């Protein structure tokens, strides 16, 4: 693909852009003495739609293949760094490719109902959400990234203690490696 310098998302099939990303990530890992790295694309940004980038129609697979390639390149320079990922945006869909080289994948649960308990079999939204979440567990070790506070900004946080208690029970049974909320 052709890199558009003015563009934000970058062309994932462009070697110059790929090398820029790897160099930047290596510099950040070294500067911060990170033992685990977590790289994600910018939020709500159109992706490159050139012929090479769209060769695979599965948008989620495009990201996970690209990320695996980044990880392999970074580890050539920094062999012991570990990586995590996030199932979010267009790459939250379960990809048609293996998800490789990760300690865990954080699943962004923005498709759940906060009124009903997470494992409530009568809530169709949560049944579908948990089905997808569990399927992700077949791709990589699971983690959770919550949006419980996403609609509010300081000082308007609304504590959802019953939601947190319910989630922790479910996630503990599932053996999740990590749980994180967007805020605070």
Please provide the spans of the model-predicted regions.
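Catalytic-core regions of glycoside hydrolase
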Residues: 1-184
């Amino acid at each position: 693909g052709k890199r558009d310098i003015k563009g934000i998302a970058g062309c994932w099939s462009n070697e110059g852009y790929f090398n820029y990303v790897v160099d930047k990530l290596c510099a950040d890992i070294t500067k911060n003495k990170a033992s685990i790295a977590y790289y994600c694309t910018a939020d709500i940004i159109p992706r490159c739609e050139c012929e090479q980038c769209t060769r695979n129609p599965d948008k989620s697979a495009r990201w996970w293949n690209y990320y695996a390639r980044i990880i392999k390149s970074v580890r050539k320079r920094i062999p012991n760094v570990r990586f995590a990922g996030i199932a979010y945006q267009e790459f939250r869909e379960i990809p048609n490719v293996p998800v490789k080289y990760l300690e865990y994948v954080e699943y962004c649960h923005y498709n759940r109902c906060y009124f009903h308990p997470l494992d409530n079999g009568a809530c169709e939204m949560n049944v579908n959400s948990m089905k997808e979440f569990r399927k992700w567990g077949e791709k990589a070790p699971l983690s959770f990234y919550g949006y419980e506070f996403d609609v509010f900004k300081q000082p308007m946080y609304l504590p959802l203690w019953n939601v947190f208690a319910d989630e922790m029970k479910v996630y503990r049974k599932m053996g999740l490696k990590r749980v994180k909320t967007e805020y605070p």
